[in-house]
Amino acid sequence: MLKTRIIPCLDVADGRVVKGVNFVDLRDAGDPVEAARAYDAAGADELCFLDIHATHENRGTMYDLVTRTAEQCFMPLTVGGGVRTHQDVRALLLAGADKVSFNSAAVADPGVVAEAADRFGSQCIVVAIDAKTVAPGRWEIFTHGGRRATGIDAVAFACEMASRGAGEILLTSMDRDGTRAGFNLPLTRAISDAVPIPVIASGGVGTLDHLVEGVTEGGASAVLAASIFHFGEFTIGEAKAHMAAAGIPVRLA
């Protein structure tokens, strides 16, 4: 049985790790290179690096910072933010990323995901979906760092991305982001059930039980968290031990 991955996320703005609530009210959480080194030593399964202002500011990802972060990581590194073309994917892979995440660009031009998957393989192409509840059982995608409504149904879009060659979905509930109230489990379950590829649950972790629920109730293949790890509330080791005790297969450090 595949092991469930625990993935800390570095949301990076102006060269610093930040953490917000509902995509705003950002709080400084440290240096990304130092954070990468610490998470690698702590036994994280992967690391997610998101340049959260790149698309909104209409610029590319911070390649130098990605390279310096990757140099500290022996675990797989997923990088997103400002990724628009297959050339961007190539540049990030060369900078040290193991996987590259499309977000706003995949909504604007779904074909870019297929092109990147054809060139580099589905295994390194992630599509990040930022979704907000708009009605019971219905979730809409927002782009540009959560600033722009699209009118696109999140479940249908996830299915399209899987069919176009995405290897993984990084699913963030905007309603739950930074709230510490737990994952949006109906959203996570709906998309996990709808697509044949792994889903990373993101947005809302405040306790170790929330990580367990993302897998047992949400059906996620991996769970992502930020603030519970960044501010020292729990360690990666504690999270893995808690999940293992709940019967979830994890790679123990």
UniProtKB/Swiss-Prot annotation:
Pathway: Amino-acid biosynthesis; L-histidine biosynthesis; L-histidine from 5-phospho-alpha-D-ribose 1-diphosphate: step 5/9. It is found in: Cytoplasm. CDD domains: HisF. GO terms for molecular function: imidazoleglycerol-phosphate synthase activity; lyase activity. One of its GO terms (biological process) is L-histidine biosynthetic process. Coiled coil: none annotated. Keywords: Amino-acid biosynthesis, Cytoplasm, Histidine biosynthesis, Lyase. This is Imidazole glycerol phosphate synthase subunit HisF. It comes from Cereibacter sphaeroides (strain ATCC 17023 / DSM 158 / JCM 6121 / CCUG 31486 / LMG 2827 / NBRC 12203 / NCIMB 8253 / ATH 2.4.1.) (Rhodobacter sphaeroides).
